[in-house]
From Swiss-Prot:
The keyword Nucleotidyltransferase does not apply. GO terms for cellular component: cytosol; glycine cleavage complex. Belongs to the GcvT family. The keyword Transferase applies. This is Aminomethyltransferase. Gene3D superfamilies: Aminomethyltransferase beta-barrel domains, Aminomethyltransferase fragment, Probable tRNA modification gtpase trme, domain 1. The glycine cleavage system catalyzes the degradation of glycine. It is an enzyme of class 2 (transferase). Keywords: Aminotransferase, Transferase. It comes from Xanthomonas oryzae pv. oryzae (strain KACC10331 / KXO85).
């Protein structure tokens, strides 16, 4: 049965086109995906991300548990509210999910995990938590709204209790604080996002979500759907679980080496495979590609290299760049001469470093200059 967020009726009243996304009835756009994309890059847009799963972890050994569970090291988290992006791996080094972990206190950490992986994540986390006597609490009582764009933070801060605006203004990236709105709504405010723009992801009680969404609307923040969220995140070089990596792909094969902490004295699930791949090299690599010819790059298209065949993972037409961009997974080795199969025709590709877009601008080399 398709699930609905607390904002479902609100989306429909705003004229949203709704689609099934991982079992959730979600807005793909509110009229123009292109306009919504540019709105976020140039001003501020908001997304209903209440389908995401918030998991609270409690216990005296919760830090030790996360040192074992996650490939990145929670020992980096020393200040309450600080956050870390990480992968959670299986014993073969494959990515069970990518997630954000927040340090709330020494006996309380918070995870935000993907909607499509909710059931397997909760089962895996629950199984591993037993050894550490950690209590796993899914917070299905929460909704989540992401406000993103150059003017996003200012619009949100205007709605906060005046006593909290200074702290919210000073909040650093990948950090969160507990605050409240002018109307007394309790908010978990995180300076994170999935668009490459600045902004906040806001966790709040479900029963307060419609009122807060409407307050943002009154501020002039426009709603944006999953379509724009996808083009924005790909321009920003951000991965989509299930498309760019999965249980059979290691972080080294997904260009996520920066999320691995092989710190001394810490054994974590999947570490031995990662140590081997670091020493010997991973057999596959994820790269960013741009197609200068007309057309769109789509998931599953074959990519040919001097070292063998790979495929397009996430692909789209970039509204900011005016070109087709994609992630591709190809064999390790040279990526100088790349071609993609589009309806039987081999079309040249250029390998580029990602993100493709930062602060609304094309990154060096992306446009071929």
């Amino acid at each position: 049965m398709t699930q609905k967020t607390i904002l479902n009726d609100t989306h429909r009243a705003l004229g949203a086109k709704m689609v099934d996304f991982g079992g959730w009835d979600m807005p793909i756009h509110y009229g123009s995906q292109l306009d919504e994309h540019h709105q976020v890059r140039r001003d501020a847009g908001m997304f209903d991300v209440s389908h995401m799963t918030v998991v609270d972890l409690h216990g005296a050994r919760v830090r030790a548990f996360l040192r074992d569970l996650l490939a990145n090291s929670v020992d980096k988290l020393k200040v309450c509210g600080k956050a870390l992006y990480t992968c959670m791996l299986n014993p073969q080094g494959g990515v069970i999910d990518d997630l954000i972990v927040y340090y709330m206190s020494e006996d309380f950490f918070r995870l935000v995990v993907n909607a499509a992986t909710r059931e397997k994540d909760l089962q895996w986390i629950g199984e591993q938590a037993v050894r550490f006597d950690v209590r796993v609490e899914e917070r299905s009582d929460f909704a989540m709204i992401a406000v993103q764009g150059p003017n996003a933070r200012a619009n949100v801060i205007d709605l906060l209790d005046p006593a909290d605006t200074a702290a919210a203004s000073k909040l650093g990236r990948f950090a969160a604080l507990q605050t409240r709105s002018r109307d007394g709504i309790e908010l978990f405010l995180a300076r994170t996002g999935y668009t490459g723009e600045d902004g906040f992801e806001i966790v709040l009680p479900q029963e307060a979500a419609v009122a807060f969404w409407n307050a943002l609307l009154a501020q002039g923040v426009k709603p944006a759907g999953l379509g724009a969220r996808d083009t924005l995140r790909l321009e920003a070089g951000m991965h989509l679980y299930g498309q760019d990596m999965d249980d059979a792909v290691t972080p080294y094969e997904a260009a996520l080496a920066w999320t691995i902490a092989l710190d001394e004295g810490r054994d974590f699930i999947g570490r031995r495979v990662l140590e081997s791949q670091k020493a010997q090299g991973a057999p596959r690599q994820l790269i960013g590609v741009v197609m200068d010819d007309k057309g769109v790059l789509r998931h599953g298209q074959a990519v040919f290299t001097a070292s063998g065949e790979g495929e397009i993972l996430s692909g789209t037409f970039s509204p900011t760049l005016g070109k087709a961009i994609a992630f591709a997974r190809v064999p390790a080795g040279s990526i100088d001469q790349l071609r993609v199969d589009i309806r039987g025709k081999q079309v040249p590709l250029r390998a580029v470093k990602f993100p493709f877009v930062r602060d609304g601008q094309a990154q060096p080399g992306v446009l071929g200059d």
